[in-house]
């Protein structure tokens, strides 16, 4: 099977040809200035008169290649310490500019907005993302291999927006000390995109075509003259003081004050050392409540700032969730999920020439039967050709207990974005090999994935082996002892009709088999999505699954799934309203067979944005199951209320409940941004548990 997948992918890529793209991307020289403009969203300083100007935007959606409906003007300049952008988004109906979102770390998807990508190394494989909405919201992230941004990254930068009589304006400052770059690289990748939300119109500077996403960095333009850049001392120290009061059932109260320090030092403009003492994560966002009715563990993403910073340097083998050799979420938690305090942590991340480094060491305090210990993760990759990499990963230590454990891995990522001549089609081939050793359990795994990540056709096919005893102590494995095949095919059809923007056809197929080749589970899904020109979608689909149970499984207290081979088919459908509406919803309904019985489900999310200061959201997931072993219902609700009186102040209240644990969780957070990079938090967590029938 493995050889067959490789052969199919190689033949596919060979048929595509290997002619290099001849498309010439636009470029602009960035003028250096002496003075620093005031970031206030006005653009009235004399320095802006010296800035280079970009005006040649092309329409991407809804009518690719046609004239844009509104003019956009981008001003670019820099000092030796920062890059400055001034963007004038002209609009002949300024009263209709959508500017309702003020939140930091929000993409402002319902507002008129700008999206910017910067590639300081000009390799076309990864870069930085900056999102700005007309209401003042801002977001940042890391772009890798044409995928959507990883929004966990947090950058120190500044932006101010202002709605004017001519449209709206954004003024942006990106300090060079906040991003990694190569001092000898004077030409950077750069692209900018504007969205006029009420028209669902998308305009772009470089590669204004549906065939390339903004995040496909190989399609970016160039900004030149990026020389003699400075990062200052390269030292950033962030002291913090956490006061915590805890009240438990029974009347016991505790109060403590914990000081901590985070320090960042840029060894070079592209290499950073991070140190953290008495790391505290009180300000971390809570996980969304979910109910697990499967036989396998759930995956929860990392949300702690210390581990999210430069997390991309530890990515391995293109693996999304399982089997991960390293998942930092395991650090600071014992095997039974109890919190283990982190005494000290250190990282070295960045680039040295063609080498990419990620080194992490953490000292854990002893708690709950887990002795004090140190854990380590190291990741090194080497840039091949223009867009490819090979690398290794090593982890040492077991944060879950007192045993010893090591993981070793080798991977490669081959990418070429020059297929089919000037059309610039991209092909990728990713492979990995992993070995774990610890407490007498030694095993290995491997994986191979081929990707054709293009538009209108997208394809991904992969196969991986996960050994029965493969157990990365600092990673995550959902299901050991299997061969796992997965595939996904998508085609976007531009309708050209009056009401529809595009129609998407998606098909996925996958199976798990034991190491002897016996099928354990199968999953086939086909769905069609209709995207309206004014925003919003309609979706219908069908799914067929097969599950083999080799032993009885208690899906819920008293509800047993007997040994057997179960096949079931379900249909689903739903819709979502445009994100530009003040109120709206997303609904998905499903019904059909399930494990020898029936299941009906509803997944509903509603939002209301009455003004730029207030926003609320409620989501409900409800499943009704009628099985031979018994009937049961799962009900999960998540709600949030947000108040943003200014772009610097955010108050959020989250409420969560599920009917299985019968627990209500309440999380209140106040975040005051004193200045970019300096925040004050006030956090309240409350858990309510039903103790009796009343």
Predicted regions and their residues:
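A generic structural signal for short coil/turn motifs at secondary-structure boundaries
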Residues: 247-251, 367-369, 399-402, 514-516, ...
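Outer-membrane beta-barrel transmembrane domain signature of Gram-negative proteins
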Residues: 207-230, 364-422, 538-592, 601, ...
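Extended, hydrophobic alpha-helical segments in both membrane/secreted and soluble proteins
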Residues: 239, 257-263, 271, 277, ...
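Exposed, low-structure sequence patches enriched in small/polar residues
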Residues: 341, 418, 422-425, 430-694
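Bacterial N-terminal signal peptides
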Residues: 4-15
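Outer-membrane beta-barrel proteins
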Residues: 175-181, 216-230, 245, 267-271, ...
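Structural preference for beta-rich elements and adjacent junctions enriched in aromatics
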Residues: 21-383, 391-392, 402
């Amino acid at each position: 099977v493995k050889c067959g997948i490789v052969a199919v992918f190689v033949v596919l890529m060979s048929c595509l040809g290997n002619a290099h793209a001849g498309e010439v991307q636009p470029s602009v020289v960035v003028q250096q200035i002496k003075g620093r403009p005031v970031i206030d969203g006005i653009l009235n300083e004399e320095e802006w008169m010296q800035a280079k100007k970009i005006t040649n935007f092309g329409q991407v959606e809804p009518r690719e290649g046609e004239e844009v409906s509104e003019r956009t003007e981008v001003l670019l300049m820099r000092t030796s310490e920062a890059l400055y952008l001034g963007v004038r988004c002209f609009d002949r109906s300024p009263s209709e500019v959508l500017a309702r979102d003020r939140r930091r770390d929000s993409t402002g998807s319902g507002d008129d907005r700008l999206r910017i990508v910067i590639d300081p190394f000009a390799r076309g494989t990864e870069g930085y993302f900056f999102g700005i909405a007309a209401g003042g919201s801002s977001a940042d992230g890391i772009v890798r291999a044409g995928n959507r941004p990883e929004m966990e990254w947090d950058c120190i930068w500044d932006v101010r927006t202002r709605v004017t009589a001519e449209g709206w304006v954004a003024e942006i400052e990106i300090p060079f000390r906040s991003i990694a770059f190569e001092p000898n690289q004077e030409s950077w990748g750069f692209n900018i995109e504007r969205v006029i939300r009420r028209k669902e119109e998308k305009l772009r500077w470089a590669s204004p075509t549906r065939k390339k996403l903004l995040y496909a960095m190989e399609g970016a333009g160039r900004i030149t003259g990026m020389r003699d850049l400075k990062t200052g001392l390269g030292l950033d120290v962030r002291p913090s003081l956490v006061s915590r009061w805890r009240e438990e059932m029974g009347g016991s109260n505790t109060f403590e004050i914990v000081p901590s320090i985070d320090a960042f030092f840029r060894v070079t403009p592209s290499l950073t050392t991070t140190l953290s003492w008495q790391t505290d994560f009180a300000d971390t966002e809570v996980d969304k409540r979910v109910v697990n009715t499967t036989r396998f563990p759930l995956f929860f993403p990392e949300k702690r700032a210390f581990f999210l910073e430069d997390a991309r340097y530890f990515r391995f083998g293109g693996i999304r969730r399982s089997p991960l050799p390293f998942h930092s979420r395991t650090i600071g938690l014992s095997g039974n999920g109890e919190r283990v305090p982190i005494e000290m942590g250190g990282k070295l991340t960045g680039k040295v020439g063609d080498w990419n480094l990620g080194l992490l060491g953490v000292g854990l305090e002893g708690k709950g039967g887990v002795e004090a210990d140190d854990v380590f993760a190291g990741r090194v990759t080497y840039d091949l050709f223009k867009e490819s990499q090979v690398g290794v990963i090593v982890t040492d230590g077991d944060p879950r207990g007192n045993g010893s454990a090591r993981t070793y891995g080798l991977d490669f990522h081959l990418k070429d974005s020059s297929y089919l001549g000037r059309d610039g089609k991209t092909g990728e081939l990713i492979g990995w090999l992993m070995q774990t050793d610890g407490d007498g359990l030694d095993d290995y795994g491997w994986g191979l994935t081929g990707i054709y990540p293009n538009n209108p056709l997208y394809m991904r096919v992969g196969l991986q082996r996960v050994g029965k005893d493969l157990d990365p102590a600092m990673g995550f494995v959902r299901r050991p002892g299997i061969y796992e095949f997965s595939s996904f095919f998508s085609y976007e059809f531009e309708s050209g009709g009056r009401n529809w923007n595009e129609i998407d056809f998606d098909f996925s197929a996958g199976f798990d088999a034991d190491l002897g080749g016996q099928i354990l589970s199968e999953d086939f899904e086909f769905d069609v999505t209709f995207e309206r020109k004014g925003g919003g979608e309609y979706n219908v689909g069908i799914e067929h699954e097969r599950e083999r149970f080799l032993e009885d499984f208690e899906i819920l207290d008293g509800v047993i799934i007997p040994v057997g081979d179960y096949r079931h088919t379900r249909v689903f459908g739903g819709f979502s309203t445009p994100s530009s509406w003040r109120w709206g919803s997303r609904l998905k309904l499903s019904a059909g067979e399930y494990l020898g019985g029936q299941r009906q489900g509803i997944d509903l999310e509603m939002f209301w944005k009455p003004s730029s200061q207030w926003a609320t959201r409620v989501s409900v997931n409800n499943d009704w199951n009628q099985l031979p072993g018994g009937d049961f219902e799962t009900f999960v609700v998540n709600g949030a209320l947000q108040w943003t009186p200014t772009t610097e102040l955010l108050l959020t209240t989250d409420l969560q409940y599920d009917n299985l644990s019968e627990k209500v969780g309440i999380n209140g957070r106040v975040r005051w941004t004193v200045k970019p990079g300096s925040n004050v938090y006030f956090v309240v967590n409350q858990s309510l548990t039903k103790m009796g029938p009343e």
